[in-house]
Amino acid sequence: MTVPEEFSRFPDHWDVLPFSKAVKDATSGNTKVQKGDYLESGSIPVVDQGQSLYGGYTNEQSAICKSELPTIVFGDHTRAFKFIEERFVLGADGAKVLEPLAKLDKRFLFHYLKQLRIESAGYSRHFKFLKETYVPVPPLSEQKRIAAILDKADALRRKRQQAIDLADKFLRSVFLDMFGDPVTNPKGWPTKPLSQMASVVTGYPFKSADYVDESAESVRLCRGANVLPGTLDWKDARFWPQEHLVGLEEYLIEQDDIVLAMDRPWISSGLKVCSVDVIEVPIYLVQRVARIRARNQAMQDLIYASIDSVAFARHCCPTETTIPHISPVELKAYPIFEVPSSLLECFSQVSRTTKRKIKLFEHAERESAELFASLSQKAFSGQL
């Protein structure tokens, strides 16, 4: 058997099998639950192709997946792999149950599959690409040793992510305790439109034909693709010549500005909004991205927390249907609480302290992720 070069890195004493010889699709014969029938709570979790471990719950005992636990579930559209250790029901459309055909430890197989690079084909199905891969089959004792090492490294990464999540939940809880839910306003605060509490600017229509390469004579452009929940991502950056910036001063982003993506603003991990905490090079705002700048830092923290909330989502999506964009009119009309300056300052101090800790946690989580990736690479090349 001729193995493609990308799958020839395995040690000589490992067997290497085509995917279809090593793994089978065991989805057939299982009852699936439609998304509209998910419950918020129930006796049995529903495992679908979403990024979260569970998509919802059901009480349909007769629909429990027939596969022997633990099992691996693959998202045909999302490329997500999940390791499920308790009885579950499959969500409809795109969730596939995978079972080993060869002598494969399921944790080893799970870690191997997760590190495969399956290129995105949009909302197409990806199982066909998975079937083109090959699976290493080391001696079972070696599989278990590798899986145990990777489990420990992954547990460290997940604990650090949990610390980030807890800090974020803490800050949201402080906001609700101090000011109340913006949806119901139980404390009766007066409100003003965002446009009266802060400067709100939407970006300039920089023409892509005039983009340039990064250089000392260029500035960075902040597009919707660069805005993620809580952070800016510059992997796919675009640049503009400094000589063509005359008259565009209002689009220059300053430190602590809030930036909000207005096209497809909600993704699985949250609202695409963040505070700009580090400016390495000048950044200018592109159309369909908004910049929000309050009159003082304390108000800025309140505004950020108010926007990154369920209340803002309901303001923009009153019918709870997915919308492709936020309009400038909706954004500027969003009501912000008017609260005493003493409360503003108190919340700002808590917010600043918590966000500094979150940054430290995020740095530690990135280090853990890099360690896991390094160990994974070594593990599946026989160097661990």
Model segments located where?
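Hydrophobic residues in beta-strands and at strand termini
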Residues: 10, 100, 135-137, 224, ...
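A short glycine-rich beta-alpha junction/loop motif
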Residues: 2-4, 89-96, 110, 120-141, ...
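Short coil/turn segments at secondary-structure boundaries
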Residues: 33-39, 124-126, 187-190, 207-213, ...
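A common structural junction motif
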Residues: 117-120, 311, 355-356
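Non-catalytic DNA-recognition/assembly elements of restriction-modification systems
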Residues: 1-30, 37-52, 136-148, 155-205, ...
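A short beta-sheet element
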Residues: 48-114, 119, 223, 248-308, ...
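Sequence-specific dsDNA recognition surfaces
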Residues: 2-3, 17-69, 86, 91-92, ...
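Periplasmic-binding protein-like
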Residues: 310-316
